[in-house]
Curated annotation (Swiss-Prot):
Coiled coil region boundaries: none
Protein name: Peptidyl-tRNA hydrolase
Residue sites binding tRNA per the record: 19, 70, 72, 118
Main location: cytoplasm
Positions of the record's site feature: Stabilizes the basic form of H active site to accept a proton: 97
Keyword Protein transport part of the UniProt annotation: no
One Gene Ontology term, aspect cellular component: cytoplasm
Site description Discriminates between blocked and unblocked aminoacyl-tRNA, residues in chain: 14
Amino acid sequence: MMPHQLSLVVGLGNPGSKYDGTRHNIGFMALERLARREGFSFRQQAKLHGLSADKGFGDQRLRLLMPQTFMNDSGRSVRAALDWYGFQPEEIVLLVDDMDLPLGRLRLRAQGSAGGHNGLRSTIQHLGTQVFPRLRIGIGAPAENPAERRARTVSHVLGPFSRAEQPCVDAVLDAVLDGLDRLKTQGMERAGTWINGFRYESPSAT
């Protein structure tokens, strides 16, 4: 069992209060939950184009980053952080929303394409590589209607979770934190097995 060298966790989203709690910002939500649990304090870092926080864990130091560049330019902030701290792409993990995954599911990958995600696309462009870990957080897809697909997609990802969905969202965010703990201590393969097998089950279904 080989632990993973995790130096930087990046949550992707859009800055500004009007985007708080939206599906596209679930990466921010996960990072904020991690910060609350571990006692991190974010501060604006102009040189990183984002909000950052760091804290020591034994002889290691973990850093968090929320780009404030808007989703489509997230890679500029990620690139700046890697250059400033001297990290390699393999030492980071991006937390991103995934419309192709149903709400209640997660997927960890060590590398891969953007898969239509603009934040991942920007990061790949700025880093010049697809080889960096990403944890995709399912947000579900809007009801299918080909004639209105684009409009429905935009309103879906920029819309809030419903009250009925909130218990699932809370459980998923807790699972993301659990998955990050496993990634640090158990390594990519074992953590991936647990993360990719996670499924939210409603208490009413048990």
